[in-house]
Regions:
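Short, Lys/Arg-rich flexible segments
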Residues: 1-202
Length: 202
């Protein structure tokens, strides 16, 4: 298990305090308006953070987007708890979640050698590995030894790099500020409405 990766939307945002004061003042006449606007903006920011994290990691590593995205979890904000964060944790991923060739099953003594790449660089041979049903498998020893799945890095390891953290943190902050303006405008225009068009009370 790798150390968890976790980023809060407002940590490090110098512009947030002033924006929040403006939003609070603008929505002071609408009960629940301020908390609703902030909640929606926070949750949109954390969603964009996950998207940015996946893109930033895939700029450097060949890991598939699906397994990568599933390793991130968003703690959603509510009107009573105006906090949200983006986290990632998990064990090492199978090497088959990274780029490899060939894609078809390989069997027999004359099978094609398996090659894989973790970084966005050239493919390299993976010992005596073979491909079966889309998975890379390998034996450590004779045919009587159990099959193992060669592993690549875990997502927290991929995410806990300064360049990824900086991109995600700044992007989340920018999205929050932009969405806060939008949400305040929407509430001033239409009042408090749920996503299904119903009124929100509180």
């Amino acid at each position: 298990m790798s150390n968890p990766f976790n980023i809060s939307v407002l940590s490090g945002s110098k512009s947030a305090s002033a924006k929040l004061d403006i939003a609070r003042s603008a929505l002071s006449g609408i009960k629940g308006g301020f908390s609703t606007a902030v909640m929606r903006a926070l949750n949109r920011a954390s969603q964009s953070g996950r998207t940015n994290a996946v893109k930033a990691i895939r700029n450097e590593y060949t890991v598939k987007a699906g397994p990568l995205r599933k390793s991130f979890a968003i703690k959603k904000a509510t009107r009573k708890n105006l906090e949200t964060s983006l986290g990632a944790k998990g064990s090492r991923l199978p090497l088959s979640d990274y780029r490899f060739t060939p894609k078809q099953d390989t069997t027999g003594n004359k099978r094609k050698p398996v090659r894989a790449a973790i970084l966005n660089q050239g493919l390299r041979p993976v010992g005596s590995a073979f491909v079966w049903k889309g998975m890379i498998l390998q034996r450590e020893g004779t045919r009587s030894t159990p099959l193992i799945k060669p592993l690549g890095p875990a997502v927290p390891f991929l995410a806990n790099r300064d360049e990824v953290i900086d991109v995600v943190q700044s992007g989340m902050g920018e999205t929050f500020l932009r969405r806060l303006d939008h949400e305040v405008g929407q509430i001033l225009k239409t009042g408090l409405k749920g996503r299904n068009g119903g009124k929100i009370h509180g």
